[in-house]
Amino acid sequence: MVMAEGTAVLRRNRPGTKAQDFYNWPDESFEEMDSTLAVQQYIQQNIRADCSNIDKILEPPEGQDEGVWKYEHLRQFCLELNGLAVKLQSECHPDTCTQMTATEQWIFLCAAHKTPKECPAIDYTRHTLDGAACLLNSNKYFPSRVSIKESSVAKLGSVCRRIYRIFSHAYFHHRQIFDEYENETFLCHRFTKFVMKYNLMSKDNLIVPILEEEVQNSVSGGE
């Protein structure tokens, strides 16, 4: 897209824009982004450029507040997980996936109810993403997207643990859908590296074998 000198670039998909023309505007450096949504825009720009370049996507700009950086990444993970949830609806039905499970070792209770209880997996997925959206959009805990209190940042770990169960259920029970979406987005790879980088989850709870795959690939690549 070539713009005349001095002409402002509208960084917005207008109503009626065709899918192939989405985001058809020049990239900006982080320093040029002057809105309160700059961190979100920067993350999304890097994802669009190359979603497989996870190290680049997770590398914060110099001087970036770490709490805001983690918060904006978690918002982005929830946005993209909605895409996986839509695909799961084609075969993850309440009568076939009656509980939210991954391996046979655990049955996850849904925290969306007054008293946590079992939910069909697809309902658990919807409830979890809705609950995460409510928390991350809460003016009580996250009134600003420029600075975040440490007490609010501490809540991000519990959100990570809950939404990770969507990945694990998809991997162990809907592998074809998981693989297709992962090949398109590298979302579980990115999430796994993200929570490990910022110690938001215990390695023991990361049961989708992303880390093992990377070790195997690095070993085979060095042979």
Swiss-Prot record:
The keyword Iron-sulfur does not apply. It is a peripheral membrane protein. One of its GO terms (molecular function) is protein-macromolecule adaptor activity. It is found in: Cytoplasm; Membrane; Golgi apparatus, Golgi stack membrane. Zn(2+) binds at C92, C97, H169, H174. GO terms for biological process: negative regulation of hippo signaling. Pfam families: Mob1_phocein. Keywords: Cytoplasm, Golgi apparatus, Membrane, Metal-binding, Transport, Zinc. One of its GO terms (cellular component) is FAR/SIN/STRIPAK complex. Its main location: cytoplasm. Zn(2+) 2 binds at C110, H113, C119, H127. Zn(2+) 1 binds at C92, C97, H169, H174. Part of the core of STRIPAK complexes composed of PP2A catalytic and scaffolding subunits, the striatins (PP2A regulatory subunits), the striatin-associated proteins MOB4, STRIP1 and STRIP2, PDCD10 and members of the STE20 kinases, such as STK24 and STK26. Part of the striatin-interacting phosphatase and kinase (STRIPAK) complexes. STRIPAK complexes have critical roles in protein (de)phosphorylation and are regulators of multiple signaling pathways including Hippo, MAPK, nuclear receptor and cytoskeleton remodeling. Different types of STRIPAK complexes are involved in a variety of biological processes such as cell growth, differentiation, apoptosis, metabolism and immune regulation. Belongs to the MOB1/phocein family. This is MOB-like protein phocein. It comes from Gallus gallus (Chicken).
